[in-house]
């Protein structure tokens, strides 16, 4: 998001976050509100969020990581956020305006508590957001109808979703043949129609998408190191970004994620969405 996920990384223009639309989802013990159950004991009693009793999340559609559904977010990352909210007795509020490009700016400007949508841990992002401990690893891939690899992109028209960590490198390399999109529907629509030759995306996201919306002849080929795109050197680790000014929230996220890994919740969520559960053991935190 990968979406620094479809991937999903993502133009960091705060202006795109104007006018966020908020919708709510209850996420504590299945009750109408988290506060309605006095028996709910938060894992971190000193936790402070933008709105008391709520966990405000900036997100967008990036299946299988985030799937906007009704008034909430599901997908393996969305489900994990809801599990974290249960641990902290919080109601999840989802802000969806602005697409992928609005997520990180919304976290920076404190319009939301956390971002979601396959965001990878990178050195650059350490300067602007608190990066949680890794949720899981996420190989990146080249998606095309002609079997292109990461060595075959020069001279081709390539698409990527706003905010992807490799966007700047690929823009410099490919120039005006590199196109940035705000959402998966647009980018895969252009791939299907032949308006672009390939998409750079999360391998998990592309494979999941093709289960329900296949494109004839499309292949998903994991990237190989390419001197023009330093971000292709290693497999990325997905994280939840939060404000650098709320250290308590960042620490709580780290501890909750660790707990949910140790009790098997993360493994079950990955399996639920058809993802190899081995990616749920990403190793020590690292940055691309």
Can you name each region flagged by the protein language model?
Residues 118-126, 197-234:
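A ligand-binding cleft/hinge motif common to bilobed small-molecule-binding domains
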Residues 62-64, 71-86, 119-120, 137-189, ...:
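Bilobed "Venus flytrap"/periplasmic-binding protein-like clamshell domains
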Residues 36-118:
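Extracytoplasmic small-molecule ligand-binding "clamshell" domains
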Residues 93-105, 179-193, 205:
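Short helix-initiation/N-cap motifs at beta->coil->alpha
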Residues 23-27:
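C-terminal motif of bacterial Sec signal peptides marking the signal peptidase cleavage site
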Residues 91, 95-153:
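Acidic, polar ligand-binding/catalytic clefts
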Residues 136-141, 215-254, 277-288:
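Periplasmic-binding protein-like
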Residues 29, 78-87, 155, 164, ...:
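Extended ligand-binding regions for polar small-molecule ligands
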């Amino acid at each position: 998001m990968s979406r620094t996920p479809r991937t999903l990384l993502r133009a960091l223009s705060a202006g795109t976050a104007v006018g966020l639309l908020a919708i709510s989802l209850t996420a504590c013990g299945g009750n109408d509100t988290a506060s309605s159950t006095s028996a709910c004991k938060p894992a971190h009693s000193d936790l402070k969020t933008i709105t008391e009793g709520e966990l405000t999340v900036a997100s967008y559609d990036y299946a299988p990581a985030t799937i906007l559904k009704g008034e909430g977010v599901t997908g393996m990352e969305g489900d994990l956020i809801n599990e974290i909210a249960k641990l902290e007795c919080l109601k999840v509020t989802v802000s969806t305006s602005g697409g992928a490009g609005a997520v990180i700016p919304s976290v920076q400007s404190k319009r939301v508590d956390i971002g979601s949508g396959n965001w990878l841990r990178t050195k650059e992002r350490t300067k602007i957001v608190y990066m949680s401990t890794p949720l899981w690893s996420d190989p990146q891939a080249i998606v095309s109808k002609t079997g292109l690899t990461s060595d075959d992109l020069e001279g081709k028209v390539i698409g990527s979703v706003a905010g992807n960590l490799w966007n700047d490198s690929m823009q410099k390399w490919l120039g005006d043949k590199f196109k940035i999109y705000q959402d998966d529907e647009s980018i895969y629509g252009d791939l299907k129609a032949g308006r672009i030759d390939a998409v750079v995306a999360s391998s998990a996201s592309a494979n999941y998408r093709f289960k329900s919306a296949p494109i004839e002849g499309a292949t998903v080929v994991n990237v190989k190191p390419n001197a023009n795109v330093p971000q292709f050197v290693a497999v990325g680790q997905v994280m939840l970004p939060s404000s650098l000014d709320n250290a308590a929230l960042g620490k709580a996220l780290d501890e909750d994620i660790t707990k949910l890994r140790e009790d098997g919740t993360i493994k079950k969520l990955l399996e639920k969405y058809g993802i190899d559960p081995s990616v749920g053991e990403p190793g020590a935190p690292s940055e691309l």
